[in-house]
């Protein structure tokens, strides 16, 4: 069995914080599966296919990373991918409680599923997809928070 990990998220859009964690996970694990969740209830800016494409483009330089879209329960996706480790990012103490609940629920649904938490690089610790979209909506410069491919895609979505 290979040392495979899943990094799940909505990635709407994928940020430099996400790509930093993906790159670090790629050094720690044999294979990293970036699981892009459908999450229609979050009313994403980009549809699932667009988010998968953007994630593939910004991780193309990492040979042991693959990007896959999924719907449904994360534990079912983990079983499908034959992975028993998840990575999650913790930006602040405030993230911990929610992530702790998720980890326990996932472990209850799939006892062999472990959650590994990574903290972001300091320069990425405040970046969130929500904040990036908010800054872009109000005409702010998001180029320091996302890959140029993502910045261009956001501008195109906003008709700029």
UniProtKB/Swiss-Prot annotation:
Binding site for ATP: 10-11, 18, 89-91, 99, 124-130
GO cellular component annotations of the record: cytoplasm
Cofactor: Mg(2+)
HAMAP family on file: PPAT_bact
Amino-acid positions noted as binding substrate in the UniProt annotation, renumbered to this chain: 10, 42, 74, 88
InterPro entries noted in UniProt: Cyt_trans-like, PPAT, Rossmann-like_a/b/a_fold
Pathway assigned to this chain's UniProt record: Cofactor biosynthesis; coenzyme A biosynthesis; CoA from (R)-pantothenate: step 4/5
Protein name: Phosphopantetheine adenylyltransferase
Species in which this protein is naturally found: Aeromonas salmonicida (strain A449)
UniProt subunit comment: Homohexamer.
UniProt site positions, description: Transition state stabilizer: 18
MF (Gene Ontology): ATP binding; pantetheine-phosphate adenylyltransferase activity
Family per record: Belongs to the bacterial CoaD family.
Role of this protein: Reversibly transfers an adenylyl group from ATP to 4'-phosphopantetheine, yielding dephospho-CoA (dPCoA) and pyrophosphate.
Any single GO BP term: coenzyme A biosynthetic process
Catalytic activity reported: (R)-4'-phosphopantetheine + ATP + H(+) = 3'-dephospho-CoA + diphosphate
């Amino acid at each position: 069995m290979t040392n495979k990990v899943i990094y799940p998220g909505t990635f709407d859009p994928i940020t430099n914080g996400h790509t930093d964690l993906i790159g670090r996970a790629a050094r720690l694990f044999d294979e990293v599966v970036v699981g892009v969740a459908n999450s229609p209830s979050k009313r994403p800016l980009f549809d699932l296919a667009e988010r998968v494409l953007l994630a593939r483009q910004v991780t193309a330089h990492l040979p042991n990373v693959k990007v896959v879209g999924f719907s449904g329960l994360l534990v079912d996706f983990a079983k499908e991918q034959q992975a028993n480790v998840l990575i999650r990012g913790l930006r602040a103490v405030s993230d911990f409680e929610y992530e702790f609940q998720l980890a326990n629920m996932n472990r209850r649904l799939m006892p062999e599923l472990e959650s590994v938490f990574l903290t972001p690089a300091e320069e990425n610790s405040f970046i969130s997809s929500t904040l990036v979209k908010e800054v872009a909506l109000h005409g702010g410069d998001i180029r320091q928070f996302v890959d140029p491919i993502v910045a261009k895609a956001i501008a195109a979505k906003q008709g700029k």
